[in-house]
Amino acid sequence: MQNDAGEVVDLYIPRKCSSTNRIIGAKDHASIQINFAEVDPTTGRMTGQYKTYAICGYIRQMGESDDCLKRLAIKDKIIDAKMDA
């Protein structure tokens, strides 16, 4: 629903699982959202930017959330592909 200014208000906007692209329902209490902070390579401090991933409860139930997060982090070049071994 939009107000007169065109802003979205009072509307549930569901998230999607970053790994499977499934919609995470409102009653999926096992789902998680995790932020990876970007770090300045010279100072070693956080830059204030981060990458957000959402993992649905179905993936967590199967015990595959760690593999999914690692695969997504390699795809987004957060960790090196050499760590895949």
From Swiss-Prot:
One of its GO terms (biological process) is translation. It is found in: Cytoplasm, Cytosol; Cytoplasm; Rough endoplasmic reticulum. The keyword Endoplasmic reticulum applies. Its main location: cytoplasm. The keyword Endoplasmic reticulum applies. Keywords: Cytoplasm, Endoplasmic reticulum, Ribonucleoprotein, Ribosomal protein. Pfam families: Ribosomal_S21e. It comes from the Eukaryota. GO terms for cellular component: cytosol; ribonucleoprotein complex; ribosome; rough endoplasmic reticulum. GO terms for molecular function: structural constituent of ribosome. InterPro entries: Ribosomal_eS21, Ribosomal_eS21_CS, Ribosomal_eS21_sf. Component of the 40S small ribosomal subunit. Belongs to the eukaryotic ribosomal protein eS21 family. This is Small ribosomal subunit protein eS21. The gene is RPS21.
